[in-house]
Amino acid sequence: MPVVLVVNSGSSSFKYQLIEMDTETVLASGLVERIGEEVGSTRHKAGGDSWERELPIADHTAGFQAMLDAFADHGPSLEEGPPVAIGHRVVHGGDVFVEPTVVTEKVKADIDDLSALAPLHNPGALQGIQAAQTAFPDVAHVAVFDTAFHQTLPAEAYTYAIDRELAAAHRIRRYGFHGTSHKYVSEAAARLLGKPLEETRIIVLHLGNGASAAAVQGGRSIDTSMGLTPLEGLVMGTRSGDIDPAILFHLARHTDLGLDDLETLLNRKSGLLGLTGLGDMRDVQRAAADGDEDAQTALGVYRHRIRHYVGAYAAQLGGVDAVVFTAGVGENNPLVRRRSLAGLEFMGIGIDDDRNELISSEARFVSPDGSPVAVLVIPTDEELEIARQSLAATGN
């Protein structure tokens, strides 16, 4: 009965899940947060119960000790059932890491080097890896990269049309993100369709606060909407997605916004928040229903961008077997699904209203019977995918 511990670490917090791999059951999960602040906190769930605790947590090493204490106090026992592997989510693997990789000193140095491409994410992941190695010195640690799934993109999809020497010197290319989710969901879609993975053409729409689209052919990513960073592509909660780059030059010349201000503008003050003052899709929909014209426009922009990518990826794939919605908005918002695909019936893409309105946590069809293109809702499970990849990487 092998178990895998999955860790998703940031600069001041980390989440964890302990997963029994024979049945792929979550045995325990938790959150350690406010690391480095005067008072930190832990939350641990196991066996249907939950416990919370406040205590000083000086650093990630202390955070992992607090996690170990929670397992010792509330179970399940890590002494009786120690993990055979610990999987770490790492946002950016650049073009260095194309698959889940057992952590070595060289791997940690490479992750640190790639922090220039993901300064908000990779340093926290590295802190988590180092602390976890202290807590579990005799267990294999595996880094699973959000970007790895998209390393199969062809050159024409990942290359930006800028000076090639500058691009090479600064590692500028499309990397793509949410790869763990896109991989999990596209493989689940193939099973739901009853088709061999290598014969499928699937468009995955990962719609959460962050959002991305991917074209997956035969289980391999051939195009994706996020680029060098997670800023490109679809409209998101606070991120702009695609814009004309000259907008930044225009703002730099005609306002007092500096480089950091412009970066903050596009990452934290744009998207739905920038268009409406509201960053949550549910709030935007309520405002639109109440007649707010800005909210109505924002929803139109959001849907327009999704349709743009669905059409483009259908062309790149040479046809589509399924369009799949996943993540918080994609899984739970029937209105977004229906309106995002409205008008695509000429492509064989349509939604059955009754199926679409059904509230369920199960993977399911929301397209009519006999539809040329299946429309699916598949809950993502990035932690399980990380656990699967970690187990495979260690040979267990």
Swiss-Prot record:
Cofactor binding note from Swiss-Prot or TrEMBL: Mg(2+). Can also accept Mn(2+).
CDD domains: ASKHA_NBD_AcK_PK (cd24010)
MF terms in GO: acetate kinase activity; ATP binding; magnesium ion binding
Subcellular locations according to the entry: Cytoplasm
InterPro entries: Ac/propionate_kinase (IPR004372), Aliphatic_acid_kin_short-chain (IPR000890), Aliphatic_acid_kinase_CS (IPR023865), ATPase_NBD (IPR043129)
Family statement: Belongs to the acetokinase family.
Stated name of the protein: Acetate kinase
Species in which this protein is naturally found: Clavibacter sepedonicus (Clavibacter michiganensis subsp. sepedonicus)
Lineage: Bacteria, Bacillati, Actinomycetota, Actinomycetes, Micrococcales
Designated gene of the protein: ackA
